[in-house]
């Protein structure tokens, strides 16, 4: 069984220094790797209260679930947009051999270290306001995608003005010490930026924005909206209190989604709608509906579900549009093909064209390769 020290020893020295900085370990940097492993491992083992206070809320709540399950007991979880820090540094175990889900567990030695302290760490995060500050920060990043450091600090000061749960000095320290600044900042053309952890190539957002000259400013959102958008990491959702959002929740619930599965599908629609010009992303926006197509009785009901998803997606803030929605900017809209598309019209006029797609049982996948059942694809055209 690998110990904490064994795991740390697998990293390069430069990586260990990144871990040291993130965990806030006051250990010497300019030492041999062997000594750095010993000192960093000793810090993790002997000072859990100190380094737990440096963790993101998402990591602490995952740790709490793993502690509740017990040492070496795996939990089956979905794949989020980005891994937890503790998975990245391999302090908790994970098995990603199954493409549909991953198993995560806490090793016995880490369990012994954190179990007596994890509840207090979460309690402190809530009572100090640190979690809410983090949610506001994540919310602004989820809404805008990429911000200059100056824009980010200005927005966070808006949040502080609305809450004032800490002194300005304490609040400023919380921002400067934020794990997000350590994890999600980068330099580009002489400017310092911070980006959503859900984005893998933040530079592509900056370059993509140049294609939308009509968007000349950032849309403003209230601090409450930012906290809403940053709650529930890593599955962020937004706009569920709008008429389009309420329609979406009702429709997905009717299709059988509930609890974590419902939140995950709501989140996926927002994330995939960001890049709706990409064919793969456009299809993925509607995955929650197409996955349940066998439970939908008629094409009219199926089409209504798709319309609800598209209507909701077009109200959401987009990274490329600096927080504006597709409806507001009048671009990057999710648009469904009309029922009477060109191919359908041609087949209705000349049924022989339909022979190019062999008939299939109504609930079988359509032979055309669309991924839809035959009755919702070429079957509806031929009937």
Residue ranges and their predicted role:
Residues 1-41, 45-46, 54-383:
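Acidic/negatively charged segments and metal-coordination signatures
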